[in-house]
Amino acid sequence: MKLLSEIKGDKIVETIEKLVKIPSPTGFTGKVKDFLVKNAEKKGISYTVTKKGAVIYSFGPKDVPGMFFAAHVDALGAIVTDVDDDENRVKITTVGGYPALYIIGEICTIHTRKGKEYVSTFIPNNPAVHVNSKLKEMVPDFENCSLRVDLTLKKGEKLSDFISVGDFVSLDCGFRYVDGYVNSRHLDDKASAGIFVYLSDIIKKNESKLKSRISFFFNVTEETGQGIAATPQGDDLIVVDMGVVGGGTAGSEKCVSICAKDSSGPYNYDLTTELINLAEKNKIAYKTDVFPFYGSDGSALLRSCSDTRVALIGQGVDASHGYERTHVEGLTATASLILAYIFG
């Protein structure tokens, strides 16, 4: 398909970099919502915003059922559970699923409800190796580790004067782009969302060719299990989320994964087969895979027994929910499969 030659991988990466640098732990997604809205208004893209703050880009004839594509822009993060004024430390609880081990030494930002931001580092409570001989034996958890806040307190001030229980915490993304590899936190799922934003320009320029409506849904509650409960009447759903790379899976960072089954059960056979055939027809690098411990935006829709076909695809991502990595070839393959489905 000629249109696929217009896809530029480096431009996708540029968009992803912008997204991963916007703090958006689930429940604190206003800034990324604003980014998506401003982009739509600048490009003349029709959009709506849900009560929860999700953003939907719409293309093509609105009265002809088509395809609903979904990715999520909420990310892993944390919430403050305790402010220790004696030790000047802040304890946190996770937003989303990850072990404490995955954020040891991580630069974090505390976002207060008064609009202030404070930089901190997640480290063991007694972190000096020269005084704590048990550090080598320690298994990190959220009791023996906490946030060390970079805030100079004046006489009479307490840490709890500035930071409160319930404040949100975002994790620094640590973005790097080296030799085709994209290293960053939050590639799950801002890599897919970045593809949506990038492809929106191509689709907008070719909107007159669309024979049915196409929607890009940017969800903001996926990491806490709140997926999509419904789609517009008659639309099917293709979820675009990270493909798993690791032991026991077939995924590759340089391919698009087409998932046959995850923890929710099998995805729609006909729609999944259609995507596989499109990948082969257009010579798109892909892997058919099964994800053993995985849920997506489509999981809620499947459990609701909706009469909707659901499929799942996405670029392979290594070290999921940690310091993740994908490759520009996998991103391009995913973008190509989406575009091939829309215009194929």
Where are the predicted features?
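N-terminal hydrophobic/helix-forming segments and targeting peptides
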Residues: 1-344
